């Protein structure tokens, strides 16, 4: 008799299938081998994960604007994360990856080269839901404080002509996924929101309560 086992994890147990005979016939015996892994799985099931802050925002009432998503203390420095919401969640079509990718390249280049905010720019990148972007800046900042910067940034994207920075096989992992025309259109659309930010009946600088 030759015992040949096939391992498959099922929940917290490791199951071994066998026996298998030398002529290729299989028996119907199943045996369970309990391992330390089962205890790990039990602990994982008992661990309750809290809802993260961004999932507590009322996305039904959220409209395009500039919002403070969170502030984190890192050493003696405060990092402010801004929510640059460009479309109405669950109401308008989300942005496609090509135009978001283009906005990311242009915005990151602009911000990193900015005289005042270049050294304070930590990150600019897309939201997974494709309704906007996150901007991380060093400093304890408010939405209104960066409005001039946002107007400057999206005017730059709206008016941009030429080759998108970093749009080459050498510089980017997906350089063909670009759409400058749509990026310019979306930037112009968002710019109108920024320029009349105080004219809306609801705040576009603070999350809906």
Task: Identify the residue ranges that each predicted region occupies.
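His/Glu-rich zincin catalytic helix
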Residues: 42-111
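Active-site-adjacent, His/Asp/Glu-enriched structural segments that form or flank metal-binding
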Residues: 124-196
């Amino acid at each position: 008799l030759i015992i040949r086992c096939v391992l498959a994890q099922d929940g917290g147990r490791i199951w071994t299938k066998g026996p298998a005979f030398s002529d290729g016939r299989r028996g119907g015996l199943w045996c369970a081998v309990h391992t330390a892994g089962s205890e790990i799985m039990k602990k994982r099931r008992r661990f309750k994960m809290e809802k993260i802050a961004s999932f507590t925002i009322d996305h039904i009432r959220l409209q395009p604007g500039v919002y403070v998503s969170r502030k984190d203390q890192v050493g003696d420095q405060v990092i402010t994360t801004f929510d640059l919401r460009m479309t109405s969640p669950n109401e308008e079509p989300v942005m496609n990856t090509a135009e978001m990718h283009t906005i990311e390249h242009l915005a990151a280049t602009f911000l990193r080269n900015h005289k005042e905010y270049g050294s304070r720019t930590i990150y600019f990148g897309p939201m997974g839901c494709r309704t906007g972007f996150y901007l991380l800046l060093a400093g304890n900042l408010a939405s209104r404080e960066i409005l001039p910067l946002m107007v400057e940034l999206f005017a730059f994207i709206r008016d941009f002509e030429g080759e998108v920075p970093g749009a080459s096989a050498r510089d980017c992992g997906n350089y063909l996924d670009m759409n400058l025309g749509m990026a310019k259109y979306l930037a112009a659309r968002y710019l109108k929101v920024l320029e009349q930010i105080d004219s809306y009946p609801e705040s576009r600088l603070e999350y809906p309560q």
